[in-house]
Amino acid sequence: MTTTDGSHSLDSSVAHGSVPYGWQRKRLKELCESVQTGPSVRGADRGRTQADGDVPIVLPRDLRGHRVVTEDAEAVPAMPRERAGALERYMLREGDILVARTGTVGRLALVTGEHTGWLYHHGLVRLRLPAQGPAHAAYLAVYLGSEATQNWMRARSAGSVIPSVSTRTLGELPVLLPPATEQQTIGETLAALDEKVRVHSEIARVTGEYRRTLAEALLAGAFTVTP
């Protein structure tokens, strides 16, 4: 069945639709070594940042354009190393996928080597794939970011004030998997386009800031304009 917002079309297409030759139908939990929510931060640890030399924490707001994008070290929350040592199972490694489970449900990022060893916020879910599993991380990341998948997650979000989706529900997400070589090609192609979008968005942002600064200076007579 397809709803007006497409929220159930993913279930229908994966469960009952035709699948191209060589493709597979799987549930997300079948593809992952673990589907794990991040640890809670104790009140005593609040206020510490990466600049203090502690272990930094990825926040939901850091998931932008399928990447982890953090602010200056002084703005990145962190956990004392002595406590972080007991949370090794929560430390990120390259190829992990982070998904926001509260607030803006479905926001996601593919973790790169830059953030290996970081921790992640309890408002995020980490998907860790087995080394020899059937799913390619880059492909799964773009699949999770597709409109149909995002609609599926939003439709299953609970809470009228702050939407949230459970790890159990997320694990039931239906996934279509092409052969490994196709997964790699699809993932790399769309990831390259995501990077182009990110770069152009940054250019637009910087240009906008320059325009505002220049306009204020010109309108205040800070520069002499020659016709």
Locations of regions flagged by a protein language model:
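A short beta-sheet element
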Residues: R101-V142
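A short glycine-rich beta-alpha junction/loop motif
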Residues: W118-G123, G159-T185
